[in-house]
């Protein structure tokens, strides 16, 4: 049974999500058994990235009654002669588009969630479908974003990634203020109060109406309607405890990444969601011909020996893991004091959030040096992730268990 399930998603296709998910899962498998599950079922992206024979895939799980653990494909010895990635396996999507597998309903989705929860691995990485729909949202955690991937070269995907954050957080708030929630029973006149909360959430979500721009404005209106009420504190704490983790792909320097990817991402989050959330940059992957060539050969860059170096070289993550964990400890989100619920800013102000992200990006870049090897990038990303997995609560990074629809 997995200790942690981590989805990797993106607002749009073309940002290298599957490349990041595949190599991250491979790198993580050096430290603990890891299974990559291809939930981008319309394109079978993982199968296209790892060109090894697949005996059983999600088709056999849904149509032929195979258990999901029977659909795990391992690397052949010829691909991993030294057994460096013996802890890695993947579940491929179907070879061709099959409607009931690509657009599975609630019953099949619940069955798949249950099966993922029982996979024989410490870590399960989900390569999600690009974009945002029910077959994405239902596999995402409730209290954090999993890993979001975006790139300086596709601005529309950066903005769409912030929409994923909004969708997860609003789903969490609606669960908190639903009749089945424990909080519901603690509120005086719960039906009237939760109706008010959900009506105001509708206003924030409706981008076509010039109503409430974000959850901070939502708190202002809620305070005007309820006064000093425990609901305000519950909303504020739910937002504050939400964690956003992201990776920059096709990285080409701090200035470009910040101006064309990080800045619009943060500004959109602050203006349409809230400035109370905690953001964590897990690292980046440089733009690399090796990655492109590996994708063309259907052999991930971590499995392709670089020119002049053996494929079985010790990874930087293995040689320097303790040092990297000490290093990343100083790059975690600053322990800011809890914000008072009131007064709430009446106008979005992203500058403090932008300053924190730029400072973290600069410190990461200068501490790591100008490394242009994607292997080093994945080692670093993995070390950052392991640091979180060892220290953070399961609700802060990925999830311990999929709940399903």
Q: Which residue ranges define each predicted feature?
A:
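Conserved nucleotide-binding/hydrolysis micro-motifs of P-loop NTPases
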Residues: 41-43, 95-98, 131-132, 153-156, ...
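Inter-motif core of Ras-like GTPase G domains
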Residues: 117-121, 135-155
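Conserved C-terminal guanine-recognition region of P-loop GTPase G domains, centered on the G4
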Residues: 116, 133, 158-174, 228
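Walker A/P-loop phosphate-binding motif and the immediately C-terminal alpha-helix
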Residues: 2-41
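Conserved ATPase-coupling elements of RecA-like P-loop NTPase cores
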Residues: 101, 128, 132-139
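Conserved beta-strand segments of the P-loop GTPase G domain that flank and frequently precede/overlap
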Residues: 37, 92-93, 148-151, 247-250
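C-terminal lobe/tail of nucleotide-utilizing enzymes
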Residues: 182-405
């Amino acid at each position: 049974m997995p200790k942690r399930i981590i989805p990797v998603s993106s607002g749009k296709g073309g940002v290298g999500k599957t490349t990041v998910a595949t190599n991250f899962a491979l790198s993580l498998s050096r430290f603990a058994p890891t299974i990559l599950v291809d939930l981008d079922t319309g394109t079978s992206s993982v199968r296209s990235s790892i060109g090894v024979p697949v005996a059983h895939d999600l088709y056999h799980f849904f149509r032929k009654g195979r258990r999901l653990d029977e659909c795990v494909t391992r690397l052949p010895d010829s691909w991993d002669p030294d057994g460096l990635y013996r802890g890695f396996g993947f579940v491929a999507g179907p070879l061709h588009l099959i409607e009931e597998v690509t657009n599975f309903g609630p019953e099949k989705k619940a069955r798949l969630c249950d099966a993922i929860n029982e996979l024989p691995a410490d870590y399960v990485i989900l390569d999600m479908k690009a974009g945002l729909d029910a077959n994405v949202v239902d596999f995402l955690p409730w209290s954090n974003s999993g890993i979001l991937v975006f790139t300086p070269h596709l601005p529309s995907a950066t903005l769409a990634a912030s929409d994923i954050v909004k969708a997860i957080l609003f789903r969490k708030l609606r669960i908190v203020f639903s009749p089945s929630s424990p909080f519901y029973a603690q509120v005086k006149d719960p039906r009237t109060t939760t109706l008010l909360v959900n009506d105001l959430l509708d206003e924030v979500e409706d981008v076509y109406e010039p109503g409430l721009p974000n959850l901070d404005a939502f708190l202002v209106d809620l305070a005007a309607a309820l006064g000093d009420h425990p609901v305000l504190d519950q909303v504020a704490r739910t937002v504050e405890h939400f964690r956003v983790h992201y990776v920059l792909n096709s990285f080409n320097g701090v200035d470009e990444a910040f101006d064309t990817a990080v800045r619009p991402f943060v500004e959109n989050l602050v203006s349409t969601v809230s400035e109370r959330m905690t953001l964590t940059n897990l690292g980046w992957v440089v733009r690399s011909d090796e990655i492109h060539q590996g994708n063309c050969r259907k052999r991930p860059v971590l499995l392709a020996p670089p020119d002049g170096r053996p494929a079985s070289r010790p990874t930087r993550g293995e040689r320097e893991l303790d040092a990297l964990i000490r290093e990343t400890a100083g790059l975690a989100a600053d322990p800011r004091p809890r914000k008072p619920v009131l007064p709430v800013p009446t106008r979005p102000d992203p500058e403090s959030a932008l300053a924190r992200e730029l400072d973290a990006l600069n410190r990461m870049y200068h501490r790591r040096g100008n490394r242009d090897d994607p292997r080093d990038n994945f080692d670093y990303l993995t070390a950052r992730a392991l640091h979180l997995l060892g220290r953070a609560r399961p609700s802060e990074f990925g999830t311990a268990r999929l709940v399903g629809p």
